[in-house]
Amino acid sequence: MAKHILAPTKIESVGNKPKEILEFFADKKNWVKVPSECGYKEIVTIKPFGEIIAKFDTGNSGMSVIHADKMQVKDKKVTWSLLGKTITSDIIRKEEISVGGLRNYDEDRYDIKLNVEFLSGMYETEFTLDDREDRTPILFDREFMSRVNVMVSPDRKYVVTTKYSLD
């Protein structure tokens, strides 16, 4: 009587590989998401201010900036206005900023956090307060663009949002 030796099946020979592959792809940190295209200007929503024009500046290496009128600092809070609405925010930190380009000077700025709604998501975002009266009220940095997973089209505006009459 001949003895039969069982050879391992293909499934047995790969061990736990299928399980490892499934676990790898089930972990969201391993997912590669294709960025959405957006224009260099888009509309975002920040409560209590509502819809605001924002510029996505790929050359801005510092921090996201928001326009602030009538700033008053008391203790660890700053009261400031934008679009006729006044709010009080906790100061995260005070920084000395070197402003380059045509402006070229140093100044102290206050950093705060605000919730930004964009592309159906809500993002807690740090901003530095600055007088941007003659410029776009919000300037987003590369870190924000990475978090919301957008690729900026530098020659287009309002790709994912509608402009209305805000501009």
Placement of each model-derived feature along the sequence:
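Pepsin/retropepsin-fold aspartyl endopeptidases
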Residues: 2-167
